[in-house]
Amino acid sequence: AYLDFLRAWLKDKAYVALAYMTGILPVKKYGSHSALNMFTEYSMTNPREMAEYFGFTEEEVKELCEKYKRCFEEAQAWYDGYELVAVEAEKKRTYSMYSPKSVVDAMLSGIFDNYWNQTETYEALKIYIQMNFDGLKDSVIRMLAGDLIPINIGTFSNDMTTFQSKDDVLTLLVHLGYLSYRWTDKTVAIPNKEVAQEYINAISSMDWNEVIHSVEASKKLLEALWNMDGETVANGIDKVHQEIYILEYNDENSLSCTIHLAFYFAREYYTVIRELPTGKGFADVCFIPRKSYADKPAVVIELKWDKEAEGAIKQINDKNYVAALKEYHGNLLLAGINYDKKTKKHSCKIEKLKL
């Protein structure tokens, strides 16, 4: 009824020169069309030429960090991750967008923390991610592990009650800010450390015990890595693989998902990079210490599928993966991790280098 009122009030009326409306969601659809098709819509999935105004841009955050003497790298880890694309003169321009309220709170307080729950509550997120749609739980777990999930945003009805599939739920989470949408490849991801904490808060009060156990155990697993305790690392990865049923292996990519979830706590100290470019290929996983944690060792992890962990270490050395970390002057750990199909066990070999 309200949409009918707006349409009758605004559509094709001579007395309306311009109407400007704001809201969290795009206008409700009737079938595949907007109920108010006289509006041009700007949204998180299609910001058009307004992309740079959806939040703070990276340059604006850098200026704020300089003004308030805050660490930009920490601001990036906590509040970046939203990728908005505008098309200017037939050229795509991508903006890294930051959550404004959280950035302001961090600048004024000097503390990088989760300010999300001052305006939203994880209870709202919890309602959506535990809906009974095929593949929804799997997608959330994979995104916690750092995966990008393909999505079709075209079926979303632009409301908070009508859902036909997991894609509709995930599209809503994009509009609510719980996911970042990559327009270039039509995928979604959890944008940053702040929002990831909201997922953990929500899951901790649900029956996803296997995920919470893995996240809680990841702190000790990271310590075992630092201590070069390959056996403990291998056993910890075994446990994550056994507990989380979606992590079925068929290649090194699926092994990578397990590793990222097993070392979830690494994000507390590191920028975690998948497939870091090197002189002779790509290192599978790299942990690069943020400036605030420069005392932590950098880590290069090479993954093998049904081979030998020692062979992974050899590949790191042969392909000179460490060259990509030449600007890091602390300790460097090399970790080779292999999964044996016959024994269904992981093995881990860890070596230490001084750059």
Question: Each predicted region: which residue ranges?
Answer:
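Phosphate-binding site recognition
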Residues: A1-Y249, A266-Y269
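Conserved catalytic network of the ASCE P-loop NTPase/AAA+ motor domain
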Residues: K11-V16, K291-Y293, E327
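Switch/connector loops and helix/strand junctions flanking conserved nucleotide-binding motifs
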Residues: K28-S34, A309-A312, K342-K349
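Conserved catalytic cores of phosphodiester-cleaving nucleases, focusing on short active-site segments
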Residues: I259, A283-F287, K296-K307, K319
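Short secondary-structure junctions
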Residues: F263-T271, E327-H329
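Active-site metal-binding core of divalent-cation-utilizing nuclease and nuclease-like domains
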Residues: R267-A294
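Basic, amphipathic alpha-helical patches used to engage nucleic acids or provide basic targeting signals
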Residues: A309-H329
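Domain-level recognition of nuclease-like catalytic cores that cleave nucleotide substrates
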Residues: A324, Y328-L355
